[in-house]
């Protein structure tokens, strides 16, 4: 019966509220590190973008949060005290929610990126490449995220989130509201009970 069918697209868990405080020096990347596109994005950030941030913010720290990091990703933390590789974490929100900004400089296409939605659903603003933004039509640079492709512009956007609390909190709130409205499981499954009752 077609009336008993429903389509549920991609969704993520959203926090009930945006955290009141955050670590101004913490930048994070969220994603399963066994995938090529995530490894490539992290290496691109570490090699080409993070050094530009460290010139202005020598205390900045980059957290690579995700299961199954290969040896070359693990080695990044051994080479720099400013880089932390967490590997798998039991409670993702505990590792992500206090970040000042999340980054997604993805250069290899891979559909909708949960890494972006997860961070935004925790109230963490995201700086991302235009490639990754194309999979999420509700995104608007400067409103609910920041979209940059050039290395210096990407670094500058991260620095702005670290330096300008009002701007950071504005994008944090808008991003959180966007994900909660369009991509949260809470919203997507709100009609499930009605569907089940009618079956």
Where are these regions (language model features)?
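Short hydrophobic beta-strand element within catalytic cores of glycosyltransferases
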Residues: 115-119, 125-129
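Acidic donor-binding loop of glycosyltransferase active sites
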Residues: 82, 97-111, 122-125
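A short, well-ordered alpha-helix in the C-terminal region of glycosyltransferases
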Residues: 160, 167-181, 188-194
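Conserved acidic donor-binding segment of nucleotide-sugar-dependent glycosyltransferases
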Residues: 144-152, 160-165
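Conserved catalytic-core segment of nucleotide-activated headgroup transferases in glycan assembly
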Residues: 2, 6-98
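Flexible glycine-rich beta->alpha loop in the catalytic core of nucleotide-sugar glycosyltransferases
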Residues: 90, 107-109, 125, 131-134, ...
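Short acidic/histidine- and often glycine-rich active-site loop of Leloir-type glycosyltransferases
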Residues: 130-147
């Amino acid at each position: 019966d077609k009336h008993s069918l429903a389509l549920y697209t991609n969704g993520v868990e959203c926090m009930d509220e945006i955290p009141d405080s955050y670590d101004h020096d913490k930048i994070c990347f969220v994603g399963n590190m066994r995938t090529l596109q995530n490894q490539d994005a992290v290496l691109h950030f570490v090699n080409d973008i993070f050094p530009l941030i460290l010139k202005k913010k020598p205390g900045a720290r980059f957290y690579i949060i995700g299961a199954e990091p290969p040896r070359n990703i693990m080695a990044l933390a051994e080479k720099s005290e400013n880089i932390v590789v967490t590997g798998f974490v039991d409670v993702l929100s505990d590792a992500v929610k206090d970040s000042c900004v999340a980054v997604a400089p993805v250069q290899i296409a891979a559909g909708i990126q949960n890494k972006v939605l997860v961070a935004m659903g925790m109230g963490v603003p995201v700086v991302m490449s235009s490639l990754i933004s194309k999979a999420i039509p509700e995104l608007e640079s400067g409103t609910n995220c920041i979209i940059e492709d050039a290395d210096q512009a990407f670094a500058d956007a991260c620095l702005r989130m670290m330096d300008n609390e009002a701007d950071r909190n504005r994008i944090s709130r808008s991003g959180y509201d966007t994900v909660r409205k369009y991509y949260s499981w809470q919203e997507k499954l709100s009609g499930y009970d009605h569907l089940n009752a009618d079956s």
